[in-house]
Curated annotation (Swiss-Prot):
Compartments in which it is found: Secreted
Organism: Parabuthus transvaalicus
Domain LCN-type CS-alpha/beta: 3-58
GO cellular component, one term: extracellular region
Protein name: Altitoxin
Protein task: Beta toxins bind voltage-independently at site-4 of sodium channels (Nav) and shift the voltage of activation toward more negative potentials thereby affecting sodium channel activation and promoting spontaneous and repetitive firing. In mice, causes akinesia, depression and death.
Disulfide bonds: C18-C41, C27-C46, C31-C48
Tissue note: Expressed by the venom gland.
InterPro entries, sorted: LCN-type_CS_alpha_beta_dom, Scorpion_toxin-like_sf, Scorpion_toxinL/defensin
Length: 58
């Protein structure tokens, strides 16, 4: 089953890039900014678990 989540966007509407795949402290910080507790680096972009559409942009 797919885990619900989203790629968060910065204030300019861009995805957050990341270099270290998997557990990534920068992505964790980004996801917390967007109001969710967990995220990681997937395909070189931060992805946040259980991030609702309404919280994708900050």
């Amino acid at each position: 089953a797919d885990v619900p989540g989203n790629y968060p966007l910065d204030k300019d509407g861009n995805t957050y890039t990341c270099l270290e795949l998997g557990e990534n402290k920068d992505c964790q910080k980004v996801c917390k900014l967007h109001g969710v507790q967990y995220g990681y680096c997937y395909a070189f972009f931060c992805w946040c678990k259980e991030l609702d559409d309404k919280d994708v942009s900050v």
